[in-house]
Amino acid sequence: MHIFSKLDAFEQERSARLAHPKLSQYPTPFKINVGKLNAGVWPSSVPDLAVMEIRYGMSPNETVETAKAEFEAFIEQICSEDPWLSEHRPELEWLGTCWHPISVDENEELIQLVNQNMRLVRKRETEITGIA
């Protein structure tokens, strides 16, 4: 659980450092979410194994490779500071879908066309933002 307890601070630091203007409406645009946590076989036993599956949000200001390297360095730093973890290093495996971070210039023709049509349909100005 030592790693789990440090994820929030890492998430906040990344969100502040990698901020993107089109994602400013999100307090934490690059979420690190432990979606699955499996440990132990009985409520009163101390688990000998824990498996965390994490959603690791990435910024348009970084590549997948640099984001992964930063997370791996984060885990390595925790392990180097903890005697037990330094001898029992966690296995890190990248699973499933990887949504590459992207930012599209709002002056791109497609963006302008969608924006223009939204104004026609909604009869008001639109705001171009990002999704996290």
What spans do the regions from the language model cover?
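An extended, acidic, His-containing surface patch that forms the Zn2+-binding/catalytic region
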Residues: 1-36, 88-132
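Midchain, well-structured core segments that form catalytic/ion-binding scaffolds
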Residues: 1-83
